[in-house]
Each structure stands twice: as structure tokens, then as C-alpha cells.
Design a protein with these regions (language model features):
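N-terminal, post-signal-peptide segments of secreted/periplasmic proteins
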Residues: 20-21
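Glycine-rich, positively charged N-terminal anion/phosphate-binding segment
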Residues: 13-17, 32-108
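Well-ordered alpha/beta subsegment
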Residues: 88, 112-115
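Short, ordered loop/turn segments at secondary-structure junctions
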Residues: 58, 115-117
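Methionine-biased hydrophobic packing positions in alpha-helices, especially
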Residues: 95, 114, 130-131
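Glycine-rich tight-turn/loop motif centered on a GG-T
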Residues: 120-133
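An anion-binding catalytic pocket shared by soluble metabolic enzymes
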Residues: 29
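Short, low-complexity intrinsically disordered segments enriched in A/P/G/S/L with frequent Arg
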Residues: 2, 7-8
Length: 133
């Protein structure tokens, strides 16, 4: 999806569109491994200017199995909206089911990671490994 909008500043009070989302800023908080947890996202949002924040990488299978680590990564609150979740995995059905689950609990966007070169992600067929076939 492409973000479009009018002003050139970081927010300026004008809404921009990201697919169906109307955002107050063209700045997005990208996923940063080990950092983009709920407290970090809230601090960044409090500073201001963020239109959409994204979680750290979440393993689709772990999310479907309701593993505590995966649930902690998607932890959110009303002040942390809109929120995108970055999913990784290698089984299409698990990716689909995880995306459907995330949509059902109100996540604004799903980001499928197909670029992470980290060994532990690629060795299970996720991240950049998805682009090899």
C-alpha cells in the first residue's frame, strides 16, 4: 500500500490514507527487533508524529499456539492504535490463519516479513528465505 497525503510535515493535522486507514501522520514506526514492544511504542507515540506503529517480528505458528512470547509481542492498548503486526513464517495456511486472528482482534494492518536475513528466521523458511522460491 502507498501512503498519500497533502502536507510535507510530519503531521500538520492533515490526514493521510494507508489503504483503508486514515492516519494523522505520514511517519511510520518500523519494527526494530528487540525494541518495538508496547512500552517503547507508547513512548514514541507520546513524543508524537507517528501515524502507524509496527510490532517486532511475530512467528505465525507461535501466535496460533498462543505462546506467551508471541502474545507479549502483540500486546497493545487503546493509546497504541493503529497498530500493524509483522508476521513471519513459512507455512501459507499458518500465515493466513494468524492474519485472520490478528484482524479479528482489531489489528489495523498485517506486515508479512519477506526480507529479514537473520539466520534463526531464515532457517525455518521465514523472512528472506520466502523470496528464494
Amino acid at each position: 500500500m502507498v501512503a498519500t497525503g497533502g502536507d510535507r510535515g510530519y503531521s500538520g493535522g492533515r490526514m493521510i490514507r494507508f489503504g483503508p486507514l486514515a492516519l494523522g501522520s505520514r511517519l511510520f514506526l518500523s519494527p526494530l527487533a528487540g525494541y518495538t514492544n508496547l512500552p517503547f511504542r507508547l513512548v514514541v507515540r507520546e513524543i508524537g508524529g507517528v501515524g502507524l506503529a509496527t510490532t517486532d517480528l511475530v512467528n505465525a505458528r507461535s501466535l496460533l499456539e498462543k505462546r506467551p512470547k508471541a502474545l507479549k509481542l502483540i500486546e497493545t492498548c487503546p493509546a497504541d492504535r493503529p497498530l500493524a503486526v509483522q508476521l513471519f513464517g513459512s507455512v501459507p495456511e499458518e500465515m493466513r490463519d494468524a492474519a485472520v486472528y490478528l484482524e479479528s482482534i482489531g489489528m489495523a494492518s498485517i506486515d508479512i516479513n519477506m526480507g529479514c536475513p537473520v539466520r534463526k528466521v531464515c532457517k525455518v523458511g521465514g523472512g528472506a528465505a520466502m523470496m528464494t522460491e
